[in-house]
Curated annotation (Swiss-Prot):
Keywords (A to Z) from UniProt: Acyltransferase, Cytoplasm, Iron, Metal-binding, Transferase, tRNA processing
GO cellular component, one term: cytoplasm
HAMAP family: TsaD
Binding site for substrate: 134-138, 167, 180, 272
Keyword Lipid biosynthesis in annotation: no
Annotated Fe cation binding sites: 111, 115, 300
Protein name: tRNA N6-adenosine threonylcarbamoyltransferase
Gene Ontology biological process terms in this record: tRNA threonylcarbamoyladenosine modification
Cofactor annotation remark: Binds 1 Fe(2+) ion per subunit.
Similarity field: Belongs to the KAE1 / TsaD family.
Reaction it catalyzes: L-threonylcarbamoyladenylate + adenosine(37) in tRNA = N(6)-L-threonylcarbamoyladenosine(37) in tRNA + AMP + H(+)
Entry's EC annotation: 2.3.1.234
Gene giving rise to this polypeptide: tsaD
Length: 337
């Protein structure tokens, strides 16, 4: 069984082919970073138009990479939400159309379920149950996962997502877009302890997050200090340490609350080196294990959508020809398998 996966929820066009026996057969990705760089963020209209240009050629490239033709595809999975509506409609329309033309099932996939399942692309994949930390530019959530579609929201950000805070603070430091990864590289040169940022909402019970205050704290710190390279690196280090510590504290609480011994990290920020090191330390002390995908599968990609589609194919598939996408879509609305 082979599933073609299509990801167009934001500013990456991702196409992949997943085989239930052989694993990942093809993975094609086009990033729109250069397209949006001059604007300092994603422009939805430009994103949609670029997905229109890139999606079909990338599907052709994926088929060629896998040595397959359309006749070898058994289902088409596409991201149906959450995300930018215009961008989602591109992938959904193409996915539905191809499925109809090829006479195979079309499977709408939840973008965050794709991220959550991405570590299962690795040889060392997690078993249920586990706590999932979904951490990206648009989401920061802690979720109890006891099976496919069996998701309970434990906590989430009440304002900025962690990845959004990274990008905004990077912009304050004068770093190029997208600034989060650049800030992390700069932080490696920073001095530990020169600046100390707060660990928001860790002094009270609960598993919710808040990162907007860190951005304000960073802005004030930048304004009140010199603009030399070392100072900027020290501020970057203090900011990253604060975010990483906050995430670690909340993850530890979630694991203690659920009694689970497995932690899954997913989403773009899960590729952060400092966060991975910290979580390895936390799980070692708890006698548990942390799982995450390789960096290229942490950010948006077609492989996670193809895998999620393969898994969802085992459940009930909607055969209607309607193209429905959702800008907002709670994970809790997904049916269990």
């Amino acid at each position: 069984m082979r599933v073609l996966g299509i990801e167009t929820s934001c500013d990456e066009t991702g196409i992949a082919i997943y085989d239930d026996e052989a694993g990942l057969l093809a993975n094609q990705l086009y990033s729109q970073i250069k397209l949006h760089a001059d604007y300092g963020g994603v422009v939805p209209e430009l994103a949609s138009r670029d997905h229109i240009r890139k999606t079909v050629p990338l599907i052709q490239a994926a088929l060629k990479e896998a040595g397959l033709t359309c006749k070898d595809i058994d289902a088409v999975a596409y991201t149906a939400g959450p995300g930018l509506v215009g961008a989602l409609l591109v992938g959904a329309t193409i996915g539905r159309s191809l499925a109809f033309a090829w006479d195979v099932p079309a499977i709408p996939v939840h973008h965050m379920e794709g991220h959550l399942l991405a570590p299962m692309l690795e040889d060392n994949s997690p078993e249920f149950p586990f706590v999932a930390l979904l951490v990206s530019g648009g989401h920061t959530q802690l979720i109890s996962v006891t099976g496919i579609g069996k998701y309970e929201l434990l906590g989430e950000s009440i304002d900025d997502a962690a990845g959004e805070a990274f990008d905004k603070t990077a912009k304050l430091l004068g770093l190029d877009y997208p600034g989060g990864p650049v800030l992390s590289r700069m932080a490696q040169k920073g001095e530990v302890g020169r600046f100390v940022f707060p660990r928001p909402m860790t002094d009270r019970p609960g598993l919710d997050f808040s990162f907007s205050g860190l951005k304000t704290f960073a802005s004030n710190t930048i304004h009140n200090n010199s603009d030399d390279e070392q100072t900027r690196a020290d501020i970057a280090r203090a900011f990253e340490d604060a975010v990483v510590d906050t995430l670690a504290i909340k993850c530890k609480r979630a694991l203690e609350q659920t009694g689970f011994k497995r932690l899954v990290m997913a989403g773009g920020v899960s590729a952060n080196r400092a966060l991975r090191i910290k979580m390895e330390e936390v799980m070692a002390k708890l006698g548990g294990e942390v799982f995450y995908a390789r960096p290229e599968f942490c950010t948006d990609n077609g492989a996670m959508i193809a895998l999620a589609g393969m898994i969802r194919l085992k459940g009930e598939v909607n055969d209607s020809l309607g193209v429905i996408v959702k800008a907002r879509w709670p994970l809790s609305e997904l049916p269990p398998l």
